[in-house]
């Protein structure tokens, strides 16, 4: 049986992971809003288009980096989760899959 301190530590970790997921999704939404605004170029010339493409490429790289970081954080802590935790019948693998699904759904919108 787990000690109260261990349970608190595990709950704290889960809340941190969920907060990180929410922050990442919010960050991705901000990038998407920025991308949508930047695509509308009036009177385009080659220099303006190249600058906007560069900005879009940079935003896309940030988005990919945020997703990779989130996956890394979740997978690094998978052993800790599988040793200690089951949330309403969910295994650690299922929790991580849910996090990845959230990212995929967000990516589609």
Curated annotation (Swiss-Prot):
Keywords: Coiled coil, Host cell membrane, Host membrane, Hydrogen ion transport, Ion channel, Ion transport, Membrane, Phosphoprotein, Signal-anchor, Transmembrane, Transmembrane helix, Transport, Viral ion channel, Virion
GO molecular function, one term: channel activity
Compartments in which it is found: Virion membrane; Host cell membrane
CC per GO annotation: host cell plasma membrane; membrane; virion membrane
InterPro entries named among the record's database cross-references: Flu_B_M2
Post-translational modification: Phosphorylated by host.
Site features described as Seems to be involved in pH gating, chain residue numbers: 23
Quaternary data: Homotetramer.
UniProt miscellaneous comment: Influenza B virus genome RNA segment 7 encodes the M1 (AC P06816) and BM2 proteins. Normal translation produces the M1 protein. The M1 termination codon overlaps the BM2 initiation codon in an overlapping stop-start pentanucleotide 5'-UAAUG-3'. Termination of M1 translation triggers reinitiation on the BM2 AUG in the +2 open reading frame.
Protein name: Matrix protein 2
Organism of derivation: Influenza B virus (strain B/Singapore/222/1979)
Chain's gene name: M
